[in-house]
Amino acid sequence: MKEIAVVILNWNGIELLKKFIPNTVNYSKEANIYVIDNFSSDGSVEFLKTNHPNINVIELDKNYGFAEGYNRGLKNVNEEIYCLLNSDIEVTENWLEPIIKEFNNINTSIAQPIILDYNNKEKFEYAGAAGGFIDKYGYPFCRGRVLNSIENNINQYKDSKIFWAT
């Protein structure tokens, strides 16, 4: 089995960490968990070090924003697979198993679970839905969402190829 890292970028997100990190820790036993801290001033780093000493905290020297923050932090992560997880995501039991299984296929370079709306678990999440595609004109679109219309999840997009992940 390949080594996997769950990597979360944080900036002043202590309340999100308090709410969502416990499930991430409990349901990610097969992974090493990292939090890249983008120079928070809200006590996030202290909270993690005190309450979750098994989480690897990578402290950046300033707020580099989303992409550069991840890129700088990932230089300190040595696992073979990176699972980039937003700090406001609630993971569920066994969430990593299908992702790990998919990465055992040498032709897989990216994978995304179906992302459901936090407040309405029957619907896809607006921004990520179920992965995405590029149409023939070069426009990106999500499976599970057409403009502002969000579909219910009835497993219609289970195990299908995607062009991009969120």
Task: Please provide the spans of the model-predicted regions.
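Cell-envelope/extracellular polymer assembly enzymes that use nucleotide-activated donors
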Residues: 3-5, 32
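A conserved acidic beta->alpha catalytic loop
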Residues: 14, 23, 37-46, 62
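Short, acidic, metal-binding catalytic loop of nucleotide-sugar glycosyltransferases
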Residues: 23-31
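Short beta-strand/loop segment that forms part of the nucleotide-sugar
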Residues: 30-39, 58-60
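Glycine-rich, basic loop-to-helix element that forms the pyrophosphate-binding segment
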Residues: 60-77, 87
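Short aromatic/hydrophobic "clamp" motif used to bind/position activated sugar donors
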Residues: 82
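Conserved donor NDP-sugar-binding/catalytic core segment of glycosyltransferases
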Residues: 90-139
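A recurrent flexible, glycine/aromatic-enriched loop bordering the glycosyltransferase active site
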Residues: 139-142, 147-166
